[in-house]
Design a protein with these regions (language model features):
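N-terminal secretory signal peptides that target proteins for export/translocation
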Residues: 1-3
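Bacterial N-terminal signal peptides
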Residues: 8-19
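Bacterial Sec-dependent signal peptides at the C-terminal "C-region" and cleavage site
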Residues: 17-27
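Low-complexity, Ser/Thr/Pro/Gly-rich disordered linker/stalk regions
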Residues: 25-263
Length: 263
């Protein structure tokens, strides 16, 4: 099973390639130590607090319904969170905004984010509510909040390259229903194969510090690694429309990679 409308994915790939050609990745920094499942020896590329819509090496595009808002329950910075607004009538197949960060060809990385979904939340009729993406030069992998329009919802991962074959990576360790209206800690680790075709690539993710999915025989594309990270929470699928105003919110967003001695 593949995510709907591959043509839209390919258009997005082409768009980000043009946008990132002149964008250099920043210097590495010491790990913050705030993410319990971050591998040892990793260094931070970014620890974005979301006190502005575009700073600290991040950029934005196609952004019409994003803003910085306070959230008293936010775990790290209650005075400032990034909010994506889905107003009543919002159509499927688009995101309220896209925020992106350059990765300069990484084959192993860790992502940590703090994320909240409004309550109530109207899921898309396709069951797909996309959260975040990692882009290589010809394909991407998406993390998705998956479930029917009224829920329940869980987090799944979909590698969208031909080597993978189109199957969902579903929670295979701990399967939990996501609570709406609450902040969640989401951690994501990916590592390319030791050699193309080896079949030993890794995709893992944790929800609220608990391992949800662990896949250690994942095929990856034959390329130079991930070149861009995106928060681009596309609703759907195509078709369908929001019947009320809802939101996604993000507090800190963190990305780290192996230090020189661990590469």
């Amino acid at each position: 099973m593949t995510l709907p409308h591959l043509s839209a994915v390919l258009l997005s790939v082409a768009t980000f390639l043009v946008a990132c050609q002149s964008t250099a990745a920043p210097s590495l920094m010491p790990s913050t130590g705030e993410w319990p499942n971050e591998p040892g020896g990793f260094l931070a590329m970014t620890n974005q607090p979301w006190n502005d819509l575009a700073n600290h090496g991040w950029n934005r595009r196609d952004s019409t319904d994003d803003r910085i808002v306070a959230d008293a329950d936010a775990p790290s910075s209650p005075g400032a969170t990034l909010e994506y607004i889905y107003p009543a009538g919002f159509p499927g197949g688009t995101a309220p905004a896209t925020h992106y960060f350059p990765l300069d060809g990484r084959k192993e990385l860790f992502v940590g984010l703090q994320w909240k979904v409004s309550s109530p939340w109207q899921g898309h009729s396709s069951a797909v509510n996309k959260m975040q993406f990692l882009y290589a030069k010809g394909a991407d992998v998406a993390m998705v909040m998956y479930g029917p329009p009224a829920g329940p919802f869980e987090i799944r991962v979909m590698p969208q390259w031909r080597e993978h074959g189109g199957a969902w990576l579903t929670p295979n360790v701990n399967r939990r229903t996501l609570a709406l209206g609450k902040w969640h800690s989401v951690e994501w680790y990916l590592k390319y194969e030791s050699a193309y075709g080896a079949g030993d690539g890794i995709v893992r993710w944790w929800v609220n510090r608990e391992l949800a999915g662990n896949y250690t025989h994942v095929r990856f594309p034959d390329d130079e690694g991930f070149v861009e990270y995106q928060i681009s929470p596309t609703w759907g699928g195509v078709g369908d429309s929001k019947t009320r105003s809802e939101y996604f919110r993000f507090d800190h967003s963190y990305i780290s990679v192996p230090g020189p001695e661990h590469e």
